[in-house]
Amino acid sequence: MQPRVLLAVTLLALLVSARAEEIQESSLLGVMKDYMQQASKTANEMLTKVQESQVAENAREWMTESLDSMKGYWTSLIGRLSGFLDSTPSS
């Protein structure tokens, strides 16, 4: 084989090998990019669920406090009305 042909074949083999490594690196980079996007999406979804859960918990607490307050007001009103009705003279 002539040295020029041997040199050309060697350079061609190196070029093909370098291109194959570049494709593998870009493929690996794509996989990592997809993984990071999926992880970010999952983290955002979980954060949203936690925030919604906290809002729901706050709403339940507010409703419980409001109902307890209304119950206390109603009990107080009934007590005053029954005291007022008991003290009124009957005819």
UniProtKB/Swiss-Prot annotation:
Top-rank taxon, per record: Eukaryota
Protein name from the UniProt record: Apolipoprotein C-III
Chain positions found as Methionine sulfoxide: 63
Chain segments carrying region Lipid-binding: 68-91
Signal sequence bounds: 1-20
Any one GO CC term of the record: very-low-density lipoprotein particle
Site (May interact with the LDL receptor): 41
Gene: APOC3
Entry similarity comment: Belongs to the apolipoprotein C3 family.
